[in-house]
Structure formats: C-alpha cells, structure tokens
A protein has these predicted regions:
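Extracytoplasmic "Venus flytrap"
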Residues: 46-73, 78-95, 99-101, 107-111, ...
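Short, solvent-exposed amphipathic alpha-helices that sit
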Residues: 58-75, 152-156, 179-197, 211, ...
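Hydrophobic beta-strand scaffold residues
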Residues: 77, 125-128, 199
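Hydrophobic alpha-helical segments within soluble ligand-binding/sensing domains
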Residues: 89, 144-169, 181-182, 209-213, ...
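Flexible loop/hinge segments that line or gate small-molecule binding clefts
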Residues: 103, 111-151, 162, 168, ...
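Hydrophobic alpha-helical
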Residues: 103-121, 187, 198-201, 205-266
Length: 326
C-alpha cells in the first residue's frame, strides 16, 4: 500500500562474474494550475525532467514510464542529465524554464543546493514534482514521491541482526542525497540498539559502481575487515562486491543494497550478495505520471506519497522478475 499525505586494466577471472553484472547495470545506463500554457488546450504540454544521473538504469526506467504516458497523450517530455553535478542541474532547470515547460519532475543531485533552482521555478509559476528523494525545503515543491528509504535501511539491518549475532560493518554512502542519507540512517538507527554491531568504516560512493569499487578497496587496503557492507544502492553494492572478491573476502562478507536491480537479484540468487531492499521504478514512474496530470488539470493530488519497499533475499528472490525491474 502506498502511504500518502494530502496536499494540493586486466581483470582476474574470479572477479569477472560480478563485473559482468556491473557492466550490464552501467550499460542499461504549489499546484500552479493557472500556468499560462495549461490553458492552451490546443498546444501540447511540455514536461521537463532532470535526474541526478542517467548512469543508473533505475532513473531510465522511471523516465521510460513517464514517457509512455506523456507521449501517449500527445504531450512532450524533455529529459536532462546533470551527471551528478548540481550546478549543471540548476542550469538545466533554468534552460527548461526558458523552454516554457509546464511542470518539472526532479530528482536532485543535492537536496540542499537545489534550492535556488526551485525558487526560480516557483517564481515562474512552474510546479515541481520531486521523485525518489526529498528537498530541504518542501514548501518549494508541489509533491514529493519516494520509496520508504528509511524503511529500506531498517529492513537490511533487521536481516543482518537476524542472521548474525554480531558484525563489524562498512557503510557506502551518498551524503548529498536525502534518499541515500535516509537509507543509511535507518540502517544505523536499527543497529544502535545492540552493541554487538559496530560501524568500523565508511566512504562516499556517490551511488556509483565505479566509485564504490576503489573506495571499498581503499578501506580494505587500510586493514579494515568487515563482516558486512551496507550500500545505499545496488550499484554501490556491486562495486563493493568486486573489491571484496579481489581481496578474497566476499564469501565471508554480507553485502546489502537498495534498489532491486536485475543484476543484484542475479547475484542474490547465486549467493554472492545477501539482500537488497527493492524499490519499484516502474511504480514510481506510473504514480508520477498520474500526479503530473492531476496537478496540471487542477485536480486533487497527494503532496507526499511514500511507496513501500520489500527485502529480497535468496529465500524469496525467485518470486521476483529476474530479468527486469519491479
């Protein structure tokens, strides 16, 4: 059930399976109802979107779902990729505003540094729907649609506590995103009740596999020996797994992620990865499309929408679509 709140070099052979999965992942890689263009029924609506990065196929799936609905109505979707650069994202938003978009769908690179662009959108009378995260000032947006990110961290921590009597844990974070912070916070808050679980290292992976692998390698080179790794998302988890396997430590280390990516589910099925708290980019995209048109048509809509998450483990992974997203 969706929760809502009302509101208007050479690679060693042993590492190749994980990196192959990683390569697949990378390759896939306020209601302003009086806005002038909305009243012009004979002209297509223009919806702008900008996600923190299109290097994560999670956002490509969301965008595809939006595009299916928007283009089926004869409207226009303009998608931009800031590539994890907040200044670039702010500039993209300014450009979209100059292109006379009617509404902006946003996944911010930095939930705080996005505010100047949000203020410009508000001044232009363009409503903003935030997806898969939050912003520091929710008064500047019409609606926020996100998975239960804090709950995703809780699920991973509870599984660790139910399967290991104690653990030394490494965290792979993405501090500039509210969603990433909430996942790690939910995980840490849950472990905090038991002194047998300790955080012994942490690094910022920016949610990217190609960053997570060397960051995890650095920690291991420093002599850190984790029993578990909590990653804010599946690309980071896959990067951590590659580093752990390079050091011959993967078999003894529990690895957790968040997303439910096909590659992660495959690794869980093979016993290489422990679990992932699964999101549904398909559902997120569908809900976003519904909300976009509710706002533009002056209909009632929910200001906050929280989409539940579930934990995928080796025990239940076969009940999920192994080749696609939820």
């Amino acid at each position: 059930m969706v929760s809502t709140t009302k509101g208007k070099g050479g690679i060693p052979l042993r590492t190749r399976p994980i990196l192959a999965a990683a390569a697949l992942l990378l390759a896939a890689g306020l209601a302003a109802v009086t806005h002038q263009a909305v009243s012009q029924a004979d002209e297509p609506l223009r919806i702008g979107t900008t996600y923190m990065t299109m290097n994560n196929p999670f956002y490509s799936v969301i965008d595809e779902e939006l595009r299916l609905v928007i283009e089926s109505r004869g409207d226009i979707l303009l998608t931009r990729d800031p590539a994890l650069d907040q200044e670039r994202q702010n500039e993209e938003i300014r450009d979209l505003l100059h292109e006379n978009i009617d509404l902006l769908v946003l996944n911010p690179v930095d939930y705080r540094e996005i505010e100047p662009a949000l203020q410009e959108a508000q001044k232009a009378g363009v409503p903003v729907v935030v997806i898969d995260s939050q912003v520091s000032n929710p008064d500047l947006v019409a609606c926020t649609i996100a998975s239960d990110n804090y709950g995703a961290g809780v699920l991973c921590a509870e599984h660790l506590m139910n399967t290991r009597d104690s653990a030394k844990v490494v965290l792979l974070e993405h501090a500039s995103t509210k969603s990433g912070r909430d996942r790690i916070q939910g995980f840490c808050d849950t472990l905090a009740s038991d002194v047998n679980y300790q955080i012994i290292g942490r690094a910022d992976s920016a949610g990217q596999l190609e960053v997570a692998m060397p960051e995890m390698d650095k920690l291991l080179e420093q002599g850190i020996v984790p029993d578990a790794v909590m990653s804010l998302n599946d690309p980071s988890a896959l990067g951590a797994m590659a580093a752990l396997q390079e050091h011959g430590m993967l078999q003894d280390t529990a690895v957790y992620g968040v997303d439910g990516a096909p590659e992660a589910k495959s690794m869980i099925s093979e016993g290489a990865m422990t679990a992932t708290a699964t999101q549904s980019p398909i559902r997120l995209g569908q809900i976003t499309a519904q909300t976009v048109y509710a706002i533009l048509n002056g209909e009632d809509y929910e200001k906050e929408i929280t989409v539940p998450v579930a934990l995928v483990t080796r025990d239940n992974v076969n009940s999920y679509d192994m080749d696609g997203w939820q």
